[in-house]
Amino acid sequence: MKDSIKQKLENLVERYDEVGALLGDPDIIADQKKFRDLGKEYSELEPVVICYQEYRTVIENIAEAKMLMNDGDADMREMAQEELKTAEAQLEPLETQLQKLLLPKDPNDEKNVFLEIRAGTGGDEAAIFSGDLFRMYSRYAERAGWRIEIISENAGEHGGYKELITRVVGQGVYSQLKFESGAHRVQRVPETESQGRIHTSACTVAIMPEADESEEVELNKGDLRIDTFRASGAGGQHVNKTDSAIRITHIPTGIVVECQDERSQHKNRAKAMSLLAARINSAQAEQFAAEQASERKSLVGSGDRSERIRTYNYPQGRVTDHRINLTLYKLDEIMEGSLDEVIQPLVNEHQADQLAALAN
């Protein structure tokens, strides 16, 4: 292990002990926010410190075994040889685990997200595929125990959606869905195609972490134009009687958001403001990521929604993720929400990128 990484680990052990002492300080205990923040830091440091303590123990065992191998007694040397073999086998997995624990944490990983799906090229077929993608993500969310709320929808003429915006609520949502942003391409024979020709259509998916109250974007009221209108779609007679739907335009950026999910104008406004904050944050993050990507080409995680990331080929039953050259002949299962086999390799690739950067 590099000396620079060892030094970083020693510093983290010191900080862990320091935070542990602070958590017993009556002044800290009296300050709820400070106590909560330190408690969070302590729990984040703990797995790193425990792993590093195991690593140090193994290093000591190796040194001790090597010393015993110089012993004159043959039985002692044989025992030391076995101990050395065992300890060295433990060392590499611990080093790998420590490096992964040292990887920079994405502060958005535990956040809820706004999931946007928009039909692109392909007309009606693209809108139908938007509906298929929404069903895929909904099934995946069900398996993960997440909740999906529809913020706004624009239905396609022959099924699916021209545009759909949802909020996905649950544990670790962003960490699992963040690599889904981009263009999703479908190749299949549309139901309306009499000649049996394969058509290619596309949809774009955007995954935006929901902003915390503490990091909510500062929005100047003078920069906002707020319009009310009557909600369309389900909701019974009530929908037609009140202008409960909200449209907010952020004039400096031209970003427009709508919410017509709730019957209450106040609730729709709150959701629309939250979506607007996420959109502005996401636009800023995309700009930063583009600047970073120009310096270091990363296969995964650019989050550019115009980038073609995946193809769903129905005649072949194939799903291909172009970023990591992953091909799976499990289209039916994936469209039913079995996304882990696609998502986990992307997470692994991202971690490999980070480990390479850490080693440098």
From Swiss-Prot:
**Residue positions where N5-methylglutamine is found in the record:** 237
What GO MF annotations does this protein's record show? translation release factor activity, codon specific
The record's subcellular locations are: Cytoplasm
Keyword vocabulary terms for this entry: Cytoplasm, Methylation, Protein biosynthesis
Domain of life per record: Bacteria
* Record InterPro entries: PCRF (IPR005139), Pep_chain_release_fac_I (IPR000352), Pep_chain_release_fac_I_sf (IPR045853), Prokaryotic/Mito_RF (IPR050057), RF-1 (IPR004373)
Q: Name one GO cellular component term.
A: cytoplasm
Q: How is it modified after translation?
A: Methylated by PrmC. Methylation increases the termination efficiency of RF1.
**Keyword Protein biosynthesis set for record:** yes
What's the chief localization of this chain? Answer: cytoplasm
The task this protein performs is described as:
Peptide chain release factor 1 directs the termination of translation in response to the peptide chain termination codons UAG and UAA.
Q: What is this protein called?
A: Peptide chain release factor 1
